[in-house]
């Protein structure tokens, strides 16, 4: 189905009962073709981490339960889920009776797996769970004194490097793009770990800032950045992790890595989540 038929950017009515048909799928292949990514031979591994903060149902006595959820959609899934449709879908459980939280978890994981055509994993837990905030790992490059004048479209020609090999981790809180459909801002913290030619911090920060008025989904921004770095420095190893600020009760955190046996940099939320 074309994106124009989705609920994103439109006035919507919340359903009174559980409705799996609310989930709207978007094929990954469309955006990947634009980036020159072969969907049959992906240059990366990873997941999209979805943290959801509006989750409720009724127990068998009609008493409400509230919680939060974390779900992991593999990068090799055929589809992603449009975020507003996921929000409406989750809220369709508000008056739905389930035997247990585990049953709710099973239903959601099965529905997401069916829509994305991949095995989605995750968990649901109580809002009374203690949560600690983390900070981005690596060297922060945001305090560099640079002049920026490119906000029209991501400009990979800004990526420069030094002719020296390094293994390092850097981060920035200055990534911003806009939702492809609504134009609402997506604020992101990006953590990059790589082994290869040393990125010049000043030019790379300008590159990240050039996304400021870019209209793309979070997942496509992540894959564009990964592809641009890979093409620029041909690293022996590369991973990127973008932690986006919460919007509409959901935050999306794409992770991409050249390492098949990857581990996520941190399971702690950052301050903007």
UniProtKB/Swiss-Prot annotation:
What Enzyme Commission number(s) apply to this enzyme?
A: 1.7.1.13
Q: Which InterPro entries match?
A: GTP-CH-I_C/QueF (IPR043133), NADPH_dep_7-cyano-7-deazaG_red (IPR050084), QueF (IPR029500), QueF_N (IPR029139), QueF_type2 (IPR016428)
The UniProt annotation places NADPH binding at 83-84, 247-248
GO function term, MF aspect, one: preQ1 synthase activity
- Active-site feature positions: 179, 186
Where can this protein be found?
Cytoplasm
Which GO biological process categories is it annotated with? queuosine biosynthetic process; tRNA modification
Report the enzyme's class at the first EC level.
oxidoreductase
Q: What does the UniProt record say this protein does? A: Catalyzes the NADPH-dependent reduction of 7-cyano-7-deazaguanine (preQ0) to 7-aminomethyl-7-deazaguanine (preQ1).
> What family is it from?
Belongs to the GTP cyclohydrolase I family. QueF type 2 subfamily.
* Protein's name according to its UniProt entry: NADPH-dependent 7-cyano-7-deazaguanine reductase
Q: Which organism is it from?
A: Rickettsia africae (strain ESF-5)
| Gene behind the chain | queF
